[in-house]
């Protein structure tokens, strides 16, 4: 995806240990119970409290949980079940809930973002007498900020909370942000075809047969893929933490300079001199519905990028700005532009690319004068 707000392209580099891990898994040295216990330990979960099912992906795990919760409610009551979902949830959550709603099997409420997060108070206000499930991811899928799962769980007061927590797990932040009732994890590398659905046993009441099939779930576990997922969880975290550092630093820098990089109403690129800009024309924040959300674009790809990103994350508010104009406005030396464009346009980044990006971000954060604008004589370069 071509967006600096989603650095998923950084995750695409397959580690050297992965083929070896797959071969180790094929040898079948460890039973399935070993991987269940180890993955729960890595998440800081008590193995005695959780039931775990390995699935084909987190998408399958999400669908299992939603379908089971809705069916359990329909079997118990005459009311149509109500599901709460957060804005920017994975498509496997939103599409499943919307499909059930179209078939009149449930109704749903989407909780909007507040400062890139799901507000627990908004979740509380959305609760109805027929609410059977809340689906709130551990991180915002757009900008990777953490949602307060424990606070959300408290306001739900017994209503199950299901979370997609892959980002938290691979960044090593899951112990500080543990899932509340049930969770799903996806393999870091999609071709392994492995996902995890875990849930507290107290939530299992009435859900077990609907999800686990009474022990009759077809097929055998993908042990090689599960072993590789376990190895990835234990070895990939240092690079994931570095990626998370890059992202946080970039977001911090964007917020620091947002009064400079946000579009200025009624002022063209040729008129962006300090003499021609009135203070009242410079916005101090982005659109109220989604503060500071910026989609960087280059040339004619702007509309295409907006459509892809806004459609995928169900976002209807945002701004497109010219990347080159921003780089010049905050006086980023031209030798760094190529590196920043890597974040924008390339799907796969190497370790060297990451190092170069870190250099640029440190330059942005420590050297760049706050609010600096280009002199008039250079403005025409970006028209």
UniProtKB/Swiss-Prot annotation:
Residues binding pyridoxal 5'-phosphate: 58-59, 184-186
Organism expressing this protein natively: African swine fever virus (strain Badajoz 1971 Vero-adapted)
Chief place of localization: virion
Subcellular location: Virion
Cofactor names: pyridoxal 5'-phosphate
Induction field: Expressed in the late phase of the viral replicative cycle.
Keywords carried by this UniProt record: Late protein, Pyridoxal phosphate, Virion
Protein name per its UniProtKB record: NifS-like protein
SUPFAM superfamilies: PLP-dependent transferases
Taxonomic superkingdom: Viruses
Keyword DNA repair: no
UniProt record similarity statement: Belongs to the class-V pyridoxal-phosphate-dependent aminotransferase family. NifS/IscS subfamily.
InterPro entries per UniProt: Aminotrans_V_dom, PyrdxlP-dep_Trfase, PyrdxlP-dep_Trfase_major
Pfam families: Aminotran_5
Gene3D superfamilies, per database record: Type I PLP-dependent aspartate aminotransferase-like (Major domain)
Organism ancestry: Viruses, Varidnaviria, Bamfordvirae, Nucleocytoviricota, Pokkesviricetes
Gene Ontology CC terms, in alphabetical order: virion component
């Amino acid at each position: 995806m071509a967006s600096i707000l989603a650095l998923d392209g950084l995750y695409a580099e397959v580690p050297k240990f992965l083929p070896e891990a797959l071969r180790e898994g094929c040898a079948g040295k460890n039973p399935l119970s070993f991987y269940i216990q180890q993955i729960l330990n890595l998440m800081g979960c008590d193995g005695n409290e959780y039931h775990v099912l390995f699935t084909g992906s987190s998408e399958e795990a999400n669908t299992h949980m939603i379908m089971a919760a809705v069916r359990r409610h329909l079997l118990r009551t005459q009311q149509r079940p109500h599901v709460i979902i957060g804005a920017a949830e994975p498509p496997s959550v939103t599409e499943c809930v919307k499909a059930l709603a179209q078939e009149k099997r449930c109704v749903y409420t989407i909780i909007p973002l507040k400062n890139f997060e799901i507000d627990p108070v908004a979740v509380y206000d959305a609760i109805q007498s027929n609410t059977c499930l809340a689906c709130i991811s551990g991180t915002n899928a757009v900008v990777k900020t953490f949602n307060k799962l424990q606070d959300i769980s408290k306001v739900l007061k017994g209503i199950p909370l299901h979370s997609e927590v892959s980002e938290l797990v691979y960044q090593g932040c899951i112990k500080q942000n543990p899932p509340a009732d049930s969770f799903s994890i996806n393999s870091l590398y999609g071709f392994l075809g492995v996902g995890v659905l875990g849930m507290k046993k107290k939530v299992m009441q009435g859900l077990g047969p609907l999800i686990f099939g009474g022990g009759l779930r077809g097929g055998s576990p993908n042990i090689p893929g599960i072993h590789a997922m376990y190895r990835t969880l234990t070895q990939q975290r240092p690079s994931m933490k570095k990626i998370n550092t890059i992202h946080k630093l970039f977001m911090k820098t964007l917020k620091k300079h947002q009064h400079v990089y946000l579009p200025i109403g009624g002022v063209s690129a040729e008129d962006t001199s300090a003499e021609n800009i009135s203070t009242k024309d410079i916005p101090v924040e982005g659109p109220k519905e989604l503060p500071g959300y910026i989609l960087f674009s280059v040339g004619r790809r702007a509309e295409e990028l907006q459509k892809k990103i806004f459609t995928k994350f169900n976002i209807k508010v945002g701004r497109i700005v010219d990347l080159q104009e921003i780089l010049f406005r905050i006086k980023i030396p031209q030798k760094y532009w190529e590196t920043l464009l890597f974040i924008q346009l390339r799907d796969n980044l190497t370790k060297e690319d990451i190092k170069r990006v870190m250099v640029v971000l440190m330059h942005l954060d420590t050297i760049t004068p706050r609010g600096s604008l280009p002199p008039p004589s250079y403005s025409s370069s970006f028209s």
